[in-house]
């Protein structure tokens, strides 16, 4: 099975799938500013019920993505990563059109779940690039790739809000579908992969996949680290606007300030991710991961002690710059410990744990805030990251299998 494209076509693939990740990130985030309004339009009027059903509609996509990811990862190792990119982009485009026609909350939930099942563009993009990029440039390549979805997620809510104001809620779903279809077309014509399909009987079992890992204990730790990164990122989401209101008092532009402070980590990530990736290629991604996990703890604790919102914004910018190094470092370390034949499944397992973190992070933050106050969320999150730091440090000290 030959996975390496000729010459430097991996660079072309990197730039094309970066654009695909950008379109996917933008497409997903286009609808986020008005999802509660769409739930309300579907008949959920009570305030408490609206909060509940909006949360369910948001989380169900990640839940079903986590369930489906291992299946698609196994299929990508048999049929190729480009096919999975095409399947994901086209499938999500079709579902977005159907969401635009939803008539009640149950139809929306089913379609949001289907969106999670058919998703997976980003992990398959990671697997494609990971199996093609020279090892010495893997940190930079995966760091650069990570900025694609971040860029799309940053610009998506702004464009989505403008489109919803201009054209209404439902047309935005059709526009999102068009964006995802463009992603499908770009991938179809411009991504190259030299892949020899593997028959079902020759495909490795799950036990064989894990047995083939160079350092199974470390890879499992990296899966867990991915989940904790998303838990730490998402734990603040439910309380951020309310915490800013507590810090700022009665201000007229709360929504604008909250939006800016919510966005600054992504802006910092765009700047720092490729640079940390190059640093990881030079000194080792394990050192970068341990260093940034430790730094993030020292960013989280002061957030509980700030006295005004601009201090919170500055700390979130620094945290975003630090966090940008973590997932690419994890992915690079995973790449070091796998063979190309199992890349799809291993990256899909990692994505599944990432989705679990996306679901549990906001739930944890909301629970801690409800019982102990907003500031306790930052202390609790720092404690979780500290536990992960110790676990990672111990795992890195475990000898690699010969």
UniProtKB/Swiss-Prot annotation:
Localisation: Cell inner membrane
Claim: Cell inner membrane is one of the keywords in the record: yes
SUPFAM superfamilies: MFS general substrate transporter
Membrane topology: Multi-pass membrane protein
Any one GO cellular component localisation term in the record: plasma membrane
Key words of the record: Cell inner membrane, Cell membrane, Membrane, Transmembrane, Transmembrane helix, Transport
Molecular functions per Gene Ontology: transmembrane transporter activity
CDD domains: MFS_MdtG_MDR_like
Lineage top rank: taxon: Bacteria
Keyword Nucleotide-binding: no
Leader sequence residues: none
Residue stretches spanning the membrane: 14-34, 52-72, 90-110, 113-133, 149-169, 171-191, 219-239, 254-274, 288-308, 318-338, 376-396
Coiled-coil intervals: none
NCBIfam families: PRK09874.1
PANTHER family: MULTIDRUG RESISTANCE PROTEIN MDTG
Record-stated family: Belongs to the major facilitator superfamily. DHA1 family. MdtG (TC 2.A.1.2.20) subfamily.
HAMAP family for the chain: MFS_MdtG
Name used for this protein in its record: Multidrug resistance protein MdtG
UniProt source species: Proteus mirabilis (strain HI4320)
Lineage per the UniProt record: Bacteria, Pseudomonadati, Pseudomonadota, Gammaproteobacteria, Enterobacterales
Protein encoded by which gene: mdtG
């Amino acid at each position: 099975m030959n996975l390496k494209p000729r010459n430097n076509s991996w660079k072309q693939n990197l730039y094309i799938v970066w654009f695909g990740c950008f379109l996917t990130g933008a497409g997903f985030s286009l609808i986020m500013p008005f999802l509660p309004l769409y739930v309300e339009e579907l008949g959920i009027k009570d305030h408490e019920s609206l909060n509940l059903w909006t949360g369910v509609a948001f989380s169900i996509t990640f839940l079903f993505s986590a369930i489906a990811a291992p299946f698609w990862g196994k299929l990508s190792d048999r049929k190729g990563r480009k096919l999975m990119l095409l399947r994901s982009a086209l499938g999500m485009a079709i579902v977005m059109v159907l969401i635009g026609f939803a008539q009640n909350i149950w139809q929306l939930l089913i379609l949001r779940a289907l969106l999670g099942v058919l998703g997976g563009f980003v992990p398959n993009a990671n697997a494609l690039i990971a199996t093609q990029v020279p090892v010495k440039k893997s940190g930079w390549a995966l760091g650069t790739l990570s900025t694609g979805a971040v860029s799309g997620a940053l610009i998506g809510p702004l464009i989505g809000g403008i489109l919803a104001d201009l054209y209404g809620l439902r047309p935005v779903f059709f526009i999102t579908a068009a964006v995802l279809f463009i992603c499908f077309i770009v991938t179809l014509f411009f991504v190259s992969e030299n892949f020899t399909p593997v028959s079902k009987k020759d495909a490795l079992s799950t036990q064989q996949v894990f047995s083939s890992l160079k350092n199974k204990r470390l890879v499992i730790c990296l899966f867990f680290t991915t989940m904790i990164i998303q838990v730490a990122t998402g734990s603040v989401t439910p309380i951020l606007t309310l915490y800013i209101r507590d810090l700022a008092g009665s201000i007229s532009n709360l929504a604008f300030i909250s939006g800016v402070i919510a966005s600054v980590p992504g802006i910092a990530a765009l700047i720092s991710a490729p640079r940390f990736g190059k640093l990881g290629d030079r000194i080792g991604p394990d050192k970068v991961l341990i260093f940034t996990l430790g730094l993030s703890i020292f960013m989280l604790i002061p957030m509980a002690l700030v006295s005004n919102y601009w201090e919170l914004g500055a700390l979130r910018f620094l945290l975003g710059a630090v966090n940008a190094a973590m997932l690419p470092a994890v992915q690079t370390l995973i790449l070091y410990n796998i063979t190309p034949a199992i890349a799809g499944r291993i990256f899909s397992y990692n994505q599944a744990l990432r989705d679990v973190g996306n679901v549990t992070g906001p739930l944890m933050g909301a629970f801690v805030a409800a019982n102990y106050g907003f500031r306790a969320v930052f202390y609790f999150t720092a404690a979780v990251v500290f536990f992960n730091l110790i676990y990672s440090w111990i795992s890195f000290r475990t000898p690699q299998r010969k």
